[in-house]
Amino acid sequence: MRYHLLGWLVLCIGCSSAPIGNTGIQTNTYDSSVYVWQKIMDSAQWKKNYNFQLFSIRDTIWTFHPDGNWYSADDGQHWVKSLLPNSIHNLAFLDYIVFKDAVYGLGYFEGNIETHLFKPHIYRTRDMQSWEVLTEQSNLPKRFFYHPFVFKDKLWIIGGEDERQQFADVWNSDDGIHWVKQLDQLPFGKRSGSVVVQLKHKLYLLNNDVWSSADGVNWVKETDAIVPGEQIFGYAALVYDEKIWLLGCNRNGQFSSQVLVSSDGKKWEGMDAPWSPRGGIAATVHRNKIFMTGGKYGGTPDHTEFMYSNDLWVLSKKNK
């Protein structure tokens, strides 16, 4: 494992109100918000890939990767491959989630959109060494391309799709096994790939637009577009320093390294980052820092081949 520590790269969200590039995003000054990115390593132990996950659990950071799972107890400086295997199989279609001090695997997916095998298995690990199959016959909705989230001590699912259609419903569960549909025909319509985060006491559903909710069922639109005039997708979303952060955005079909930040889901500022443009990254908040790795770049007329990443970066708030 190679370690490459850059000097501190100080990145402020704005010192002026000038637009960044041609994005329509304005930079504004946060009174006490000065952030720094630090590269921990050029190449982590896991293979270069995208659409996998990072977790923070019990003061340890975990990488859940298609080829296995790794953990670090020293802020990403050293990693150990775990005996814990990949249970849900295709991480591009389904997610793991931390719930009640354990990691849950919701379903099993093998194949692609057109031809696949889906099983409503529910997996759980508490010791981070082996999986317990809670059931092979849950009523987990048969779908993919959704991102489960935790709210009010329950697991939640919004939207997603199967091989025929997208959905506009919301489900929740106390245990991951028994799922109850709370509402259909949500006001934002059928969609998949939305990310839901909790900022303070409200949920924010993020796609190209932004909706908020205090109860997970009733939703209010905050903005029609995160970046007016652009289509934004493929990002990782998380909450850090009482703000929503979007990392690894695809903007109008072009991958970007600019991070988008908002304190209310309505107004968004851009912050340039030193890592290469990419989408499909893995990110988490751990010990009051943002950790990110993975992702892919390419698929455009001027860069037809995809390039994948496994470098590891950390963002923290600079002490004054």
Which residues does each predicted region cover?
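Sec-dependent signal peptide recognition
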Residues: 2-8
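C-terminal motif of bacterial Sec signal peptides marking the signal peptidase cleavage site
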Residues: 13-14
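Kelch-like beta-propeller repeat domains
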Residues: 19-320
